[in-house]
Every structure is written in C-alpha cells, then in structure tokens.
UniProtKB/Swiss-Prot annotation:
InterPro entries noted in UniProt: Elafin-like_sf, WAP_dom
Protein name in UniProt: WAP four-disulfide core domain protein 12
Subcellular location: Secreted
Keywords: Antibiotic, Antimicrobial, Disulfide bond, Protease inhibitor, Secreted, Serine protease inhibitor, Signal
Ranges of residues in domain WAP: 25-72
Family matches, as PROSITE patterns: WAP (PS51390)
Length: 85
C-alpha cells in the first residue's frame, strides 16, 4: 500500500504544477523550465506550492525533487508564422 500512496501523491503534485490558471491579460505565464535529469530516486521536496517560494521563483519538479526555481517564458501561445509556399 505504501508505494501506491506515494505514486498517487506524486501524480497529484506533478499534475498540479502542470495546470496553469488564467492570469491577468498581458501577464507573462510562469512555467517550469525543462528538466532533462533522469532520477534513480526522488529528493525530499523543498516546496509544495509557489507560495513557498520567493517572489521571482515558482515550485517545480527540478533535478529529482520539488524545488524553487526561476520560471521561463511560456511560448506555447505565440503563433509561428507559416512559410509561404
């Protein structure tokens, strides 16, 4: 039962960091930077939400555990111009 509980908890924590709410128009979205580290085990969390971090940082799963990190700009809504064929 213990491993299943940890799996459910981690799934909820990861999914909550992926959900972005609608902000003020013109406000830049704050998203977690890409993390390319493969982990053998997870570190103890240093944060549980953005409220646990400083003004400029957000709580992200980063290098094997939840940590306060500087966000990156979200370019997902910027339209890429199509080439003229």
């Amino acid at each position: 039962m213990w491993p299943n509980s940890i799996l459910v908890l981690m799934t909820l924590l990861i999914s909550s960091t992926l959900v972005t709410g609608g902000g003020v128009k013109g406000e830049e979205k704050r998203v977690c930077p890409p993390d390319y580290v493969r982990c053998i085990r997870q570190d103890d969390p240093q944060c549980y939400s953005d409220n646990d971090c400083g003004d400029q940082e957000i709580c992200c799963f980063w290098q094997c555990g939840f940590k306060c990190v500087l966000p990156v700009k979200d370019n997902s809504e910027e339209q890429i111009p199509q080439s003229k064929v």
